[in-house]
Regions:
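RNA-binding basic/glycine-rich loop and surface signature characteristic of RAMP-family CRISPR effectors
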Residues: 1-261
Length: 261
């Protein structure tokens, strides 16, 4: 495997489906030629004793490097994994013989999405004309299933990007930020699902400050974005049933708002 050049970034993903995190930690130590020897343990005399020893093994008694080695491993993980340098990660899995790559506080933090108006999930009954087994086919011709959908909902989520943490901790760059915007805008285009229907990102408003620590509190900027139902709309069933506005008169100096969508 080719090692990245100084300053070169890679766009691997640390947390993936079925990924084994400790193997990624080992990659960091191997790439940096950091040899760490696990603590020696006395062999158990019997299988039962081995099981008991495993149960009594304290979580803190794990394979780990020195503080300098952990710092180097953490830097390697940030350089190679886009999600680590973006969102951060806890890379101390507290597993026997696991390598410690430290903890990273990511500069990008996203809150939980909430619907603008109350929603009610709808249960849909599905009839399957195929039968699972030959025995079932003797007694029935169809099988019934259920799926839950939401007829329509508009969600809002607030997020934060810390330029200070990006510079000091993970090396998250302006190029990385542009990739993040593209990912957010297109995240449902490559992951369509019958259960989610025509889900899409409708608005992406970005507030940019001209100083590293910001020129205004985030909540004041979020309060300038107003979402409300249009007159006469009782139960929204479409995006056009809402009015979405940004009160630019309340945005302070040295802060700009860009509508990405």
């Amino acid at each position: 495997e080719r090692a990245p050049a100084d300053g070169e970034k890679r766009f691997e993903i640390y947390v993936r489906e079925k990924a084994i995190l400790n193997l990624q930690h080992e990659r960091a130590y191997s790439a940096l030629n950091l040899a760490v020897t696990p603590e020696e343990q006395a062999p158990a005399a019997t299988e039962n004793e081995a099981t008991d020893a495993k149960k009594k093994k304290p979580a803190k008694d794990k394979r780990k490097g020195s503080a300098d080695e952990v710092a180097l491993a953490r830097q390697w993980m940030c350089q190679n994994f886009f999600d680590v340098r973006t969102f951060g990660a806890v890379m101390t899995t507290f597993v026997k013989s696991a390598l410690n790559c430290g903890q990273v506080r990511g500069p990008v933090q996203l809150g939980f999405a909430r619907s603008i108006d109350p929603i009610v999930p709808q249960e849909v009954t599905i009839t399957r004309v195929a039968i699972t087994t030959e025995k079932d086919a003797e007694n029935k011709n169809t099988e019934i299933g259920r799926k839950y959908i939401i007829p329509y909902a508009l969600y809002r989520v607030d997020g934060y990007v810390s330029a200070n943490l990006a510079r000091k901790v993970t090396g998250f760059s302006e190029d990385d930020l542009q990739y993040l915007w593209k990912a957010i805008i297109n995240m449902f285009e490559y992951d369509h699902s019958a259960a989610r229907g025509n889900m899409a990102v409708r608005e992406l408003n970005v507030f940019k400050h001209d100083s590293e620590l910001g020129n205004a509190p985030a909540y004041k900027l979020f309060d300038t974005i107003h979402v409300q139902k249009k007159d006469g709309v009782i139960a929204p069933r479409n995006y056009t049933d809402y009015d979405i506005t940004v009160d630019e008169s309340k945005i302070p100096e040295h802060v700009t708002c860009t509508r990405m969508i």
